[in-house]
Amino acid sequence: MAEELKRSIPLLPLRGLLVYPTMVLHLDVGRDKSVQALEQAMMHDHMIFLATQQDISIDEPGEDEIFTVGTYTKIKQMLKLPNGTIRVLVEGLKRAHIVKYNEHEDYTSVDIQLIHEDDSKDTEDEALMRTLLDHFDQYIKISKKISAETYAAVTDIEEPGRMADIVASHLPLKLKDKQDILETADVKDRLNKVIDFINNEKEVLEIEKKIGQRVKRSMERTQKEYYLREQMKAIQKELGDKEGKTGEVQTLTEKIEEAGMPDHVKETALKELNRYEKIPSSSAESSVIRNYIDWLVALPWTDETDDKLDLKEAGRLLDEEHHGLEKVKERILEYLAVQKLTKSLKGPILCLAGPPGVGKTSLAKSIAKSLGRKFVRISLGGVRDESEIRGHRRTYVGAMPGRIIQGMKKAGKLNPVFLLDEIDKMSSDFRGDPSSAMLEVLDPEQNSSFSDHYIEETFDLSKVLFIATANNLATIPGPLRDRMEIINIAGYTEIEKLEIVKDHLLPKQIKEHGLKKSNLQLRDQAILDIIRYYTREAGVRSLERQLAAICRKAAKAIVAEERKRITVTEKNLQDFIGKRIFRYGQAETEDQVGVVTGLAYTTVGGDTLSIEVSLSPGKGKLILTGKLGDVMRESAQAAFSYVRSKTEELGIEPDFHEKYDIHIHVPEGAVPKDGPSAGITMATALVSALTGRAVSREVGMTGEITLRGRVLPIGGLKEKALGAHRAGLTTIIAPKDNEKDIEDIPESVREGLTFILASHLDEVLEHALVGEKK
């Protein structure tokens, strides 16, 4: 047997198949290196070497992952398909084994030695060929998957080696067995191996036929699914598997015993298990019962997490991850203290209410961490179906427990911190009211025996620390709101945001963008400018996005320009994040008649709000512009009526309403405005315009007015004071009843403001109006 060396033949690794000599077949080629190997072969003599991978899951096999014996092959035809792959028609020529691998830039070639075989045959070869044909004929008759034409073509083959290869290619052999035949160079050995493989396949087919006949006798013709299951039974019987469900039932029994269920739940589980054992596996009810038992054993009936009762450590963890939010932190530490003393306190039900981005969800995670408990979160936004909370009854196809029970299974503990995110976004429709279903979950007197429609057994939720989050408390139904302890989280002040950026957000973004602390420095004034002019929010989400934009610019400068340190100041800030997006109200530059600076409270914090009054000849018509809401319009009417009733005391012409039309305008007319807190501001502007006395530019005011001139309390004084301080005002006139709210204002802001607390409009006018009547 002589061998011939061929050098630098492009290599095409095959996955899950191989090619014997004289075989002609199509191949679809898509891997880049394989495509390049084909291109190289087509540019030269159209010859390529096909070798099979040992593991089909590998995309780029190495030398040790390819069988060394393959087929020296000629490419007959090549076609590029629209999807980028290539379809080739190849013809196997000779066996060969790899001598050396040659790695090129985008493909691999090999040096191979052709394995020549003797085509002559002796009497033993003739006998083996006849035996092979006889067994192949029997195999075809049993399998009925190979055509008579194929058998006829095989009988015409004269070469014994070629006959063995062709027959082997038609057998459903494992890849390693086909490779074994390819590697067998001796023709007699190859014929014997193929005969052995055929005999083995015949035995397998006979057993399959026997199983099929046994099943067919015991089934109805129309029950196709039943036939398949009976066939599986027959296979198990043939293998001697008589165990059935016994082992499975034993395992489930042990799980039920170890689950720590209450006695009544355990009794139900064992009863269902008894039903499961008796019902055939082919029954649809069988899988329903099994799924139910799996849920029962997976729930944490008694398994609890031991609380970390170290108040100092818990406080440190909360302070480390969140700036401010003192009320929430204090409430958690109070809970821990009582838990340490009593050892058996029911979990509180808290609702963190506040605008987006102030850290409600992340605070809940920190609370779980400080307590050492598991954390579970479910989003209730858009939930409309009561079954989402309580689950579906098992009579429905595909029934599942509700989100509460699913969350408890996920936690794996009886006392997790359970976050009910966006509880104010639930709504109801024809499928029920999920907020009503939440009443039982969030009632400390009832949730120790919570009942899910799917589980149908009571489950104790009393040890769970439920934390709900909401943006708008007004959309939460009253009974549900009454069950929760509301903790309002106001927006952060500029100073708080500055500290959050320096302590939390900036270090986080620097790390996420692959920078070092020494690479990027933001000056405090630059951070304040970002807060004031590039974000308008109560929280810090947009602020974090702007910091991320700065970090990206810095990363580009460091990589592309090889700079070591980037410093961002208020002067070069626009180079990083562009022009300013927002502007806040500013104090007036001079005292003016009929122009008063009011204070407004929005969802993104406090701001100033100018109110202008103009007189024009007319018949006392009151004109209101600036996209004012109904409440604000009524405040203007009340202020107007009060001024008309007090003309003598205020030094105004009694018949002014017969001479002038009065126009009250609030600038930024595209922005909707509403609320009663601009009452004293409008009244002051009216008096200023009618008396000709200017209003101090340094004064901002807020308060509701009555027809008797009383000044009533308002909300959001803290945020309004922050807006006034930012705008450069020095004096704030506020209702006397809001005195208690002043202590909530940061000390750094209080120091720069003078607060005048008024209970009547006379006090407001005394401090707001300057100069003499004109």
UniProtKB/Swiss-Prot annotation:
Record-annotated Lon N-terminal domain positions: 9-202
What GO cellular-component annotations does this UniProt entry give?
Answer: cytoplasm
- Any single Pfam family the record assigns to this protein: Lon_C
Q: Where are the transmembrane segments?
A: none
Q: Which InterPro entries match?
A: AAA+_ATPase (IPR003593), ATPase_AAA_core (IPR003959), Lon_bac (IPR027543), Lon_bac/euk-typ (IPR004815), Lon_lid (IPR054594), Lon_proteolytic (IPR008269), Lon_Prtase (IPR027065), Lon_prtase_N (IPR003111)
Enumerate the GO terms in the molecular function aspect.
ATP binding; ATP hydrolysis activity; ATP-dependent peptidase activity; sequence-specific DNA binding; serine-type endopeptidase activity
Catalytic residues as annotated in Swiss-Prot or TrEMBL: 677, 720
What biological-process GO terms show up in the record? cellular response to heat; protein quality control for misfolded or incompletely synthesized proteins
Q: Where is the Lon proteolytic domain?
A: 590-771
Q: Where does ATP bind?
A: 354-361
- What function does the entry list? ATP-dependent serine protease that mediates the selective degradation of mutant and abnormal proteins as well as certain short-lived regulatory proteins. Required for cellular homeostasis and for survival from DNA damage and developmental changes induced by stress. Degrades polypeptides processively to yield small peptide fragments that are 5 to 10 amino acids long. Binds to DNA in a double-stranded, site-specific manner. Has been implicated in preventing sigma(G) activity under non-sporulation conditions.
Protein name (database record): Lon protease 1
The protein's organism comes out as Bacillus subtilis (strain 168)
User: What lineage does the source organism belong to?
Assistant: Bacteria, Bacillati, Bacillota, Bacilli, Bacillales
The gene it comes from is: lon1
